[in-house]
Amino acid sequence: MNIIVAVDSKWGIGRNNGLLFNIPEDMNYFRTMTKNKVVCMGYNTLLSLPDAAPLKNRINIVLAPQGVEREDLIVVHSLNELFTALKNYDDDDVFVIGGGMFYKTMLPYVKNVYVTEVYSDGKATVFFENLSENPDYLKTYLSEIKSYKDIKFRFVLYENLSPEVYSFS
């Protein structure tokens, strides 16, 4: 399982239930990495998408409160239900795409974290764990530094050296 996330210079990821930056190359990277794959998200992330519609050309799984049901995506109401649903897919094809609480919950279980590091302060109110300070995560890939307008960024891969296995309760 993987996480894909864009962070600012303070490891911020969002503000007002939205993204901090709109960088076309990062959006293309997200599309390329997740197309024809499984994307898992929390309910607020789904609501933040245009028309709260599932992402096209992907299997969408949403962890949502009890009572929420949708025909156009897979809705689960607990981590047990989520991990049961994920048994149907190859672990390498699963991407956790947010939001903040869902990232925090899923981080121990993922093998790879694909991070777009943006070297700017996005004035975030929601943050991701700073993996560069966590000894359980090894930085294994760094792209060259890129720029869009006045924003500098790069793509980084962190590998979880000891991912946990979910234990059903």
Segments predicted by a language model, with ranges:
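Enzymes that bind and transform nitrogen-containing heteroaromatic metabolites
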Residues: 1-169
